[in-house]
């Protein structure tokens, strides 16, 4: 919902689930009665306990690379012990990037269903956070249980353990939703543009709002992404359009993994290799510009989970010389103006509203 707000779409009005937004990025069209879920490849701890008592230790199977992830999820949905159950549930899988896949279930009622984001429950026993709330939740739980039985000792996971990597020994359904429609960005703001991101959610929101989705082949969505290529792609968008949204996921993923070293590294690269060259290029172009810098939400090192605390933002205008003079940080953000509704930030950027 935070990313939607940044694009000026109030989640209170337009949010129908995260997975349908990601589906839009992949060209997946949802029909009436369809439900879409994110299907993460995850890691359960190696422990000899019933499935409900297992602990989830990675929401991304150790940031599994795409080839192995694709091979595992394809094998799973073709497996004779899994395929009949998936077909009975009306579920098909759409392969995504790295650990992120999408599952679409046809002719299903998900009213009341409760699914938990895996990244908010790392280290926890899964029993209390397995799907619940409606009859279809039982179907998803059985699919998840069956997936573990099939995936745990698959040769790919045996090899991953031997190499010191986390196995992708489970799938996790979450981010449920139905078909979504969002307001047209160019019509509302009078500017067309594009979205540069390695995350399907951002591309999906961009597509549904009438923006161009730009893919950078060397972008990983992690701390080791190709920062220079993403900057080049963003500046390329501005040669054709008036607006670009440049998104980086590295600090968030590092925090989910409790990886302080690479969280700091990502932030330093963001400052030196993204914000600085983008700002310099805009100044060199010789035209007035405005720049909005912010994160979409907090992610805490203490527990690796997302949080709803306000995030600091910078709104820079090349026509204005005076500013706060303070470094960009959470502490200094609290000293500045407070915007209660995140969907108003884009109005501020385009000067439709004032602070």
Where do the language-model regions lie?
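Feature captures the catalytic ectodomains and active-site-proximal regions of enzymes
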Residues: 1-355
């Amino acid at each position: 919902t935070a990313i939607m707000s940044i694009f000026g779409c109030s989640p209170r009005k337009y949010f129908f689930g995260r997975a349908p937004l990601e589906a839009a990025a992949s060209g997946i069209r949802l029909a009436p009665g369809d439900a879409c879920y994110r299907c993460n490849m995850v890691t359960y701890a190696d422990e000899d306990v019933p499935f409900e008592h297992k602990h989830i230790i990675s929401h991304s199977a150790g940031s599994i690379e795409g080839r192995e992830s694709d091979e595992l999820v394809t094998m799973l949905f073709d497996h004779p012990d899994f395929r009949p159950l998936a077909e009975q549930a009306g579920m098909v899988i759409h392969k995504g990037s790295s650990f992120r896949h999408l599952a679409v279930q046809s002719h299903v009622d998900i009213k009341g269903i409760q699914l938990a984001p895996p990244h908010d429950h790392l280290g926890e026993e899964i029993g209390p956070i397995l799907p619940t709330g409606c009859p279809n939740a039982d179907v998803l739980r059985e699919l998840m249980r069956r997936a573990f039985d099939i995936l745990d000792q698959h040769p790919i996971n045996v090899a991953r353990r031997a190499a010191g990597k986390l196995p992708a020994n489970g799938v996790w359904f979450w981010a449920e939703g139905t078909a979504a429609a969002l307001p047209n960005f160019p019509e509302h703001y009078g500017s067309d543009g594009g979205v540069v991101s390695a995350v399907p959610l951002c591309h999906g929101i961009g597509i549904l709002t009438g923006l161009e989705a730009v893919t950078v082949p060397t972008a990983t969505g992690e701390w080791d992404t190709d920062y220079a290529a993403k900057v080049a792609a963003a500046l390329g968008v501005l040669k054709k359009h008036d607006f670009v949204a440049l998104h980086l996921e590295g600090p968030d993923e590092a925090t989910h993994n409790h990886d302080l070293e690479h969280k700091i590294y990502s932030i330093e690269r963001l400052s030196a290799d993204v914000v600085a060259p983008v700002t310099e290029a805009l100044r060199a172009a010789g035209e007035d510009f405005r720049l909005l810098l912010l994160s979409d939400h907090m992610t805490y090192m203490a527990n690796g989970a997302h949080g709803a605390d306000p995030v600091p933002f910078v709104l820079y205008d090349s026509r204005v010389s005076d500013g706060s003079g303070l470094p960009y940080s959470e502490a200094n953000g609290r000293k500045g103006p407070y915007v209660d509704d995140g969907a108003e930030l884009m109005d501020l950027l385009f000067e439709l509203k004032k602070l």
